Amino acid sequence: VEYRAEALGGDTLLGDMMRALSEAQGSKAPIARLADKVAAVFVPVVLALALLTFALTWLFSGSPVTALVHAVAVLVVACPCALGLATPAAIMAGMGAAIGRGVWFKNATVMERAGRVDTVVLDKTGTLTAGRPQIAALWLAEGVDETLLFQAASAIEQHSRHPLAQALLAAAAERGISPPPASAPYSEAGAGLEADVAGIGRVRVGKPEFCGFRLPENLEGIWQIASVAAVSADGKALGAVAFADTLRPDSAAAVARLQAVGIEVRMMSGDRPAAVAQIATELGLAAAQGAMSPRDKAEAVRQLMAQGRVVAMAGDGINDAPALAAADVGFALKGGTDVAEHSADALLMNGSVGQLADALLVARATLKTIRQNLFFAFFYNVLAIPLAAFGLLSPVIAGAAMALSSVTVLGNALRLKHFAQRVC
């Protein structure tokens, strides 16, 4: 048996995951910076309270020893350990839970923003659908046969990673058609591709408008709701291909989970409005838009954010990259384009919408845990410092109480692991 190593340990998928976890856990969320600011004020205030306790106790008791014991108890019980652990403990537990579900947040700030998301925008092809479209129908222009149509289309699409391109290439291969060489390629985002194809001419593949013609009005049935790729050569129609794609098995459940916690789910796609409406009906989405260019998607996301919404965008293609970058939190599906992955703030390793629901719910739980931890830390100090100042807590008991507060914060953070197992 022969084995070939294609990457060093640090360059493997596991190495990437460990590096991402380390970098994310080392970053600070905005809420953590707030705790740091409070701690910076808290320490001198506690020192002042300890001195005041010493002075007043000595004044009223006449015993410097008793005064010193009370002052030391104040210092011990007010150690800001719990306050310092409140946020990083929750972030580490939350990041670990997310990584365990195959979700990579690039840093703690992204995770905090994800915990505040109230609107999710989803792409259609390859995100909500399986991304493995099958050819459902063909239309050939007069005088054109299937061989010419698939030669032209496969020549253009042979270097594309779009699901429709892969479907065209697979169909050409099934028919024994090899893509002829193509040169001088050009891509218009959200519209289509074109190139010079040997023996055919300047070929375009994409939306009918991009290819310079309209589909015949008598095309009915699947043509009304399918994704369509038109093909032309030198400005003349060669034909068109209708694709049928199915929903991912977990798409409906993921949308329902998000809606159940009050998150509005929208769909934006560059596909035909009829095809988008069909998927929206199956998923129960009230807001769905089709025929959107990459710029349209990004602008729509910005408009939602201008309304005060915290928006998450999920997609897998190059056409989604501008919207992913514009959103408060961009989620890219692993296996999509490199541009989408680099534009996003987080990566869904299994490439499913179910993972997106997991990510947002874990992020919400993490943010809730941080708030709980900060409350525990502040409540503990508000209660314990007066008791220590009046001599109701000895330094030994004060030390035990301080340790207990830290353990409480850590224990509360560790609940995130069980939360992730329960909701995911």
Report residues per predicted region.
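Conserved catalytic phosphorylation-site environment of P-type ATPases
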Residues: 34, 69, 82-156, 304, ...
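Helix-interface capping motifs at the ends of transmembrane segments in multi-pass membrane proteins
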Residues: 40-78, 102, 375-401
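Conserved cytosolic headpiece of P-type ATPases
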Residues: 12-16, 20, 83-97, 124, ...
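P-type ATPase nucleotide-binding
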Residues: 135, 139-263, 273, 285-301
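Conserved actuator
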Residues: 1-14, 28-31, 159-171, 270, ...
